[in-house]
């Protein structure tokens, strides 16, 4: 039967007890990890959030406590009073911090009993994630999960302290706001007081943080909850957390300096040192060299343009594409010439996923070239290709010929696939880069209009503003992304702070003056009253924690995450609601 804590006070956390406490009386509280009966003595591994300590119950020491210890089972909640002793020489456990000591149990209280858990409370378990999420409160008892939650706390506290030291104010922005033209993936909340009207949960605090700058706050941050009702891919959540930052009277270099300092502190929490200066790479260079605006710099295999070499080739697949304004690029898989044809065929199928029509290849074997296209290329063209690609005997050259966007997408992804499969990515290496000068907008063929590459409040580069009326697709923006090892950790921009320029950008994006006024009127009105130059950045906290903790799943760094189907096995959300509630909200479901 469970006993009351009845004024008993914990004196130490289990995992913090050391040889310094030998001879001292302690009180520890936690869960029974394991019970072992050995030679008339009972050994208990007591676990709390700090770790494990061994407790020994001996009938010669205290028969009542020993007898009660025979009742203990896994996950019983207990309190133990006892004396810290040095373990006998043969019983020292070097695998745990408390392995040199044990507690001689003098008094035991059973604070609560437990049923047999559906899985063992241990890091090395082999159970489905749905079961872990259904019993998340048990899953959180595992050391790795507790360590991740503690790291999350440390990251948030360090962020707050750092930004406070740099003059920032933490300001909360509304959770119930309104939907915007860009808000196709908003979560909507019906209003009971205003029938037929809906709030939207924010996908980001973007508009409000800009209004805070107009309001003279100057330096704002928030660890913000955001919501996005999108089809979930791996490591996406319908509700997520971002470190949101906005500053007035700054340029992008000020943002870079602030963020570099913050990242230095955060990565130091896990003993990772990052460089004082993080390189900056223009968007177009990232696309040209790596086929991605999130370049992974931990390995080579860069894209090489051989269009000039093959523009007059008899191989029409190459020369025809170049004549039509496309390009021919390749990657050099060093040492890949030994790859079997089946593997190359697999690469061909893979690039087709990204719109490529096929994959040409040349294997530089010891006994000469092997390639289905070599016979169509002159000796001069072959030598030119090898020179451009730094090719040597043993290499496998892989080519895509198409319009530039398809070439970049196909080869950029193939580069990553080969690197992962062939073990070309070094462990424990962290390559940061700022990617800048993104296109302000891109043409969406499905919608038949230009859409913002980031969002419609991003400022264009000053020298590109005249292109708004003639070549909007050529306008570069004052946007920037913070990238680590091929993953975007954060993104931001310098914002538009002038109403006339904002309306010009809206016009280029086919957002009419009427629609802009309807949806963003409060922001445009604010611009009439002196908006300072401002900009900022937002970091996905969950993704950042994945990197810092070395977790493979975002769900392992969130206390109560949703599944990939945006549901909760624990609470069974989302759920149906009572007909009465729907009537009060004036909602009818067909």
UniProtKB/Swiss-Prot annotation:
One of its GO terms (molecular function) is aspartate-tRNA(Asn) ligase activity. It is found in: Cytoplasm. Keywords: Aminoacyl-tRNA synthetase, ATP-binding, Cytoplasm, Ligase, Nucleotide-binding, Protein biosynthesis. The keyword DNA damage does not apply. ATP binds at residues 228-230, 237, 488, 540-543. The record marks 38, 90 as: Important for tRNA non-discrimination. HAMAP family: Asp_tRNA_synth_type1. Belongs to the class-II aminoacyl-tRNA synthetase family. Type 1 subfamily. Homodimer. This is Aspartate--tRNA(Asp/Asn) ligase. It comes from Halothermothrix orenii (strain H 168 / OCM 544 / DSM 9562).
